[in-house]
Amino acid sequence: MTAATLVTLALSLSLAQHDAAPAPAAAPVEQHGAPAPEAAAPDAHAAPAGEHGAAVEAHAAAAGEHGDAAGHEGGHDESLGAVMMHHVTDGYVIEHPGFCHGALAWNCEWDLRETFGDALRFGALDMTPTKHVMMMWFASALLLVVVLAAVRKKSLVPRGLYNFIEVLVAFVRNEIAVKNIGERDADRFVPYLVTAFFFILFLNLFGLIPFSATATANLSVTVALALFTFLITQYAAIRAMGVGGYLAHLTGGVPKSLAPLWIIMIPVEFLGLFTKPFALTVRLFANMVAGHFVILALLGLIFALGTPWVAFGSVPMALGIFLLELFVAFVQAYIFTMLSSLFIGAGLVHHGDDHGHAEEHGHAGPGMGSEHGSHVAGASPGHG
């Protein structure tokens, strides 16, 4: 998988450089109105303009299909930048190897708009799935298959895939949920935390497969994931404290005798409610985008410097970053799940009753004494 990914990225950069070369030749045809023999070349090149791929760079009318395709006319550097953006941005075209244009090719394209047509268009609302949405569907289906396959092989002595899944689930429950939420309340939120962990993990790993895409490098996806945590956190807080206690919590623990300070504390505490999902959103998005940009930049050095000798240094470095991305895929899934449990646990604790809450958990289960109370207090709303 590693070698295939690097070869795929290198071929993409090479194709972009090759397609960008004839672009300046089309300018004199439009500006000076060259004779018919000279104009025949661009017409022949633009014939397959209805298709995506090389015709996008040659025919300006189809530039809208590929975002920054017009940037190829600007020169060599812009073409490399366009390829880098193409690998991390969303779209309606999925590239894949297969049989297309009458021959086997590695750069065939699946246009989702042609597949779904007008079936998911309702007036101005276009519900046609994009590339990243398809990746989420694929990841969800694969996750369901893996979990069901693991459960079917359940035995008294866990082994193989079932053992691996069980270890991860137990880790999320015991080391993340129980430690940050408390043993008394953890089991209510374990299903969400386990689902979030595996879903993000599969999305991160999908982005490392050749011809796939990283959905977690889409800001809309990370916002949606963080929004789920935000809503669950507010639900847990209102259920634990009631509406009155929840609203009183926005005063930041300032007593009524200092009520004028509420003018300052309430806006601060209110903004604090949204800094937590914002941190979840940006952290996951930035980490997943950064790794892919580094790999593409290292491979792009081969074409930017115009010499194959650079590959002896850039390819091993890109391979190292790729292996690091495998580790990052697990780390980011863990961090998102851990922070989500931390925020949920903080929502269950009233700002002024941290010690009492800790004492309750001290009797609820082992290892849940004042340490849990101080841990949650440090993450209470308004201090994140």
UniProtKB/Swiss-Prot annotation:
Q: What does the subunit section of this Swiss-Prot or TrEMBL entry state? A: F-type ATPases have 2 components, CF(1) - the catalytic core - and CF(0) - the membrane proton channel. CF(1) has five subunits: alpha(3), beta(3), gamma(1), delta(1), epsilon(1). CF(0) has three main subunits: a(1), b(2) and c(9-12). The alpha and beta chains form an alternating ring which encloses part of the gamma chain. CF(1) is attached to CF(0) by a central stalk formed by the gamma and epsilon chains, while a peripheral stalk is formed by the delta and b chains.
Record's Gene3D superfamilies?
ATP synthase, F0 complex, subunit A (1.20.120.220)
Q: What is the recorded name of this protein?
A: ATP synthase subunit a
Q: Does the keyword Transmembrane apply?
A: yes
Annotated Pfam families: ATP-synt_A
What gene makes this protein? atpB
Membrane-spanning residues where? 131-151, 189-209, 218-238, 258-278, 293-313, 319-339
The family line of this record is: Belongs to the ATPase A chain family.
What SUPFAM superfamilies does the database record attribute to this sequence?
F1F0 ATP synthase subunit A
Q: Which InterPro entries match?
A: ATP_synth_F0_asu, ATP_synth_F0_asu_AS, ATP_synth_F0_asu_bact/mt, F0_ATP_A_sf
Q: Where is this region: Disordered?
A: 22-60, 355-384
GO cellular component terms attached to this protein's record: plasma membrane; proton-transporting ATP synthase complex
Species of origin reads Anaeromyxobacter dehalogenans (strain 2CP-1 / ATCC BAA-258)
Localization of this protein: Cell inner membrane
GO molecular function terms here? proton-transporting ATP synthase activity, rotational mechanism
Function in brief:
Key component of the proton channel; it plays a direct role in the translocation of protons across the membrane.
